[in-house]
Amino acid sequence: MNTWFLNVVDPLHQWFLGFGDIGVVLWTVLKILMIAIPLIVSVAFYVVWERKLIGWMHVRHGPMYVGMGLFQAFADVFKLLFKEVLYPSKAHKAIFVIAPLLTLAPSFAAWAVVPFDTKLVLSNANVGLLYLLAMTSLGVYGIILAGWASNSKYAFLGAMRSAAQVVSYEIAMGFALVGVMIAAGSLNLSQIVMAQAGSSGFFDWFLIPLFPLFIVYWVSGVAETNRSPFDVVEGESEIVAGHMVEYSGSVFALFFLAEYANMILVSFLISIFFLGGWLSPIQGWVSGQVSPLIDWVWNGGWPWLLLKVLFFASAYIWFRASFPRYRYDQIMRLGWKVFIPLTIVWIAVTALMVFSGVIQKGV
């Protein structure tokens, strides 16, 4: 178990419980803030990292001012906050405002069941996988409402594209997670991680036996977040900004925040489901206690999870800088004719591997 959790968080939890029901409520609010605030800050620095990384790929410098580029995202946030929120004359104002909130709320609520280390999770729900599928499916309703309430042909076309794309790839993602559930024997995300523990390091991870499902989930995750090369929802050369074309100021920033929060979420989930979460790739190869500062290298811990997340978050940026946008019909064909049949076949293969003992559950 994480030493930091035992020494700091657990005594703090017990102190809050001493205040009875009020303490339970305050502890829950504190845990929510401990996830929400770092997530918002992470989105800000993720935007800076995206601009710098794309700049390097284009042989440019990227952001260089406002704290040498480090605080450029915060400057952009303040700029958006002070901009006027304009409402189209024929828009449905109530739904126009609710839509970005409906998109943002599920992207934050999904983090409730995401574990960062052993017991370091807001809600260690036994049906965490189902909860995640439900939350990640709700965001599209905000996009549809935004397209409809804007009373714009461009916005409505982007919303319809988003609805079809999310429905298409949500099925493939769900089937991919069925394979993970079969291999782990649990819907609890912490137990899914521990099912990949063992003495063989990364050879015990689900990445190897479930590699086709890993590819399907990763590509579907990119499509779910409407990122390049699946960004037909907001294709600049076709429909300007899609469902966001009529938004400005702070309400536009909410869509922006939801998109990047979802990108970070998908990076976390793919690390948890297929790459052992916080487990070390050399776990079981080396043992012993040297120093708490370096023991995580072979024993595992949240730094490993963050390193894996950083890799996938950077891959999002690489996709944007490298690949051209797919046509709408190509995206639909990939989802329905390739990914869904592939996941169905590999679910059966996974069941056979579990039955025959090829996939062994960890500790």
Swiss-Prot record:
Q: Which reaction does it catalyse?
A: a quinone + NADH + 5 H(+)(in) = a quinol + NAD(+) + 4 H(+)(out)
Segments traversing the membrane: 29-49, 62-82, 94-114, 127-147, 166-186, 202-222, 239-257, 264-286, 293-313, 339-359
Principal location: membrane
Q: What class of enzyme is it?
A: translocase
Q: What is its EC number?
A: 7.1.1.-
- Give any GO molecular function from the UniProt entry: NADH dehydrogenase activity
Known InterPro entries for this protein?
Answer: NADH_UbQ_OxRdtase_su1/FPO, NADH_UbQ_OxRdtase_su1_CS
Biological-process GO terms, alphabetical: aerobic respiration
Q: How does the protein's chain sit in the membrane according to the entry?
A: Multi-pass membrane protein
* Localisation per UniProt entry: Cell inner membrane
Q: Name one GO cellular component term.
A: plasma membrane
Fetch the HAMAP family from UniProt.
NDH1_NuoH
Quaternary structure annotation from Swiss-Prot or TrEMBL: NDH-1 is composed of 14 different subunits. Subunits NuoA, H, J, K, L, M, N constitute the membrane sector of the complex.
Q: What does this protein do?
A: NDH-1 shuttles electrons from NADH, via FMN and iron-sulfur (Fe-S) centers, to quinones in the respiratory chain. The immediate electron acceptor for the enzyme in this species is believed to be ubiquinone. Couples the redox reaction to proton translocation (for every two electrons transferred, four hydrogen ions are translocated across the cytoplasmic membrane), and thus conserves the redox energy in a proton gradient. This subunit may bind ubiquinone.
**Family (UniProt):** Belongs to the complex I subunit 1 family.
What's the protein called, per UniProt?
A: NADH-quinone oxidoreductase subunit H
Task: Give the source lineage, highest ranks first.
Answer: Bacteria, Pseudomonadati, Pseudomonadota, Gammaproteobacteria, Lysobacterales
Gene name in the database record: nuoH
